[in-house]
Amino acid sequence: MKRLTLLPGLLFLMQAAFSQESGSCKPVNLVCDYLVNPLGIDNPAPRLSWMLNDARKGARQTACQVIVDKDSLELIAGKGTIWDSGKKDSEQILITYSGQELRPFTKYYWRVNVWDKDGVKSSSAINSFETGMMGMEYWQGAWISDNKDINYRPAPYFRKVFDARKKIWSARAYIAVAGLYELYINGEKIGNHRLDPVYTPV
């Protein structure tokens, strides 16, 4: 008997959740410079865009707001200390970043709020983008070489031995090569990419 009582309750909750979702204008598919959560961007004013998930007749966005922060928890609280575009009465789904100067080698989190045709606000999931070097003045690397001619045919191995000064929680390796590379740490290949780096126009 309890099972028969709970089942209609569950169906009611599922139906209510579906109705709420189908009746909202939610920003989805967020991209930064047309990339999803990109790494190593060097654009000081990246383009932030999104799509709308709203199947209702006459659905449209009437206003939008983009917030950016280095702490994702700030976005959950509705704050953007790095940039807050403010609420803009606009149907556009692309905004160019115009907040604080982006720092090199930094991960930023961003979120979009939109208002639908009825003035109801809806928020996107939190996405991110990570800056690269952002300028040669930040270059601190030194070339690793085997001191052989560039036409030497066998693929060389470059090895750098170092001791971590503290426990590593997250790290990023920035690599520039004249050709292709694979990165190994303690004998284990890092990542599942092939033929890195990708084609770079001159």
What are these regions (language model features)?
Residues 47-55, 161-163, 172-176:
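Short edge beta-strand/loop segments characteristic of extracellular beta-sandwich folds
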Residues 52, 58-107, 113, 117-124, ...:
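Recognizes extended acidic, P/S/T-rich segments that occur
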Residues 165, 169-187:
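Aromatic-lined ligand-binding clefts that engage carbohydrates, nucleic acids, or primary amines
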Residues 94-101, 185-202:
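Beta-strand-rich ligand-recognition modules
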Residues 1-25:
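Bacterial Sec-dependent N-terminal signal peptides
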Residues 47, 107-111, 170-172:
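Short, conserved beta-strand segments of beta-strand-rich sandwich/propeller modules, principally
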Residues 130-153:
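Low-complexity, Pro/Ser/Thr- and charge-rich linker/hinge segments at domain boundaries
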Residues 21-57, 128-135:
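Pro/Thr/Ser/Gly-rich low-complexity, intrinsically disordered linker/stalk tracts
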